[in-house]
């Protein structure tokens, strides 16, 4: 078990990204997408194993979800890493994702960056992005990353940017609306209720 980065209050990166992944898995149901998660349980996979899963699956795109950490505990912000900026669709996806996630946390959009050194970007055969969802080393970011509505919001913007990337139609959410209807003979009774 590799906890990944660990916050001041002992929040584990692995737990946060697993929660985002599980939420995203639910949100993607009902779309015309074949999705493969490298993990939906607390099982450790090496970076090379993750790349191999994506390559064996022959994925069109690969997204790796992470939480950043820095020695300077004041640092906050969201960034997305790509191997190169040669794929316009991936660039649009990464820029949108970076902006949308930064807005959730009211954190700095640190932008889309390139690296040929990150294992999952270097070893995947498809366009790949790695998102760093804020800095767990910042106590306020760590707190925000423990709020379930923020986890849901991150999963939702990942879903929405994936939908946009593939040009898919949004499906109606399976929200159950409850309606209470009152019938009144006298309008004043309705107003006074």
Label each PLM-derived region with a short phrase.
Residues 171-193:
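Solvent-exposed beta-strand motifs enriched in subsets of small alpha/beta binding domains
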Residues 31, 76-78, 127, 175-177:
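Envelope-exposed proteins and targeting segments
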Residues 88-113:
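Active-site-adjacent substrate-binding region
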Residues 22-33, 55-59, 98-106, 150, ...:
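Sec-exported extracytoplasmic/periplasmic mature domains
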Residues 2-12, 69-96:
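A short, glycine/acidic-enriched catalytic loop
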Residues 2, 11, 57, 61-75, ...:
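Active-site-adjacent mobile loop/cap segments within catalytic or ligand-binding domains
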Residues 1-51, 57, 169:
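Active-site histidine-acidic residue metal-binding/catalytic motifs
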Residues 13-16, 20, 24, 47-50, ...:
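Stable alpha-helical elements in mature extracytoplasmic
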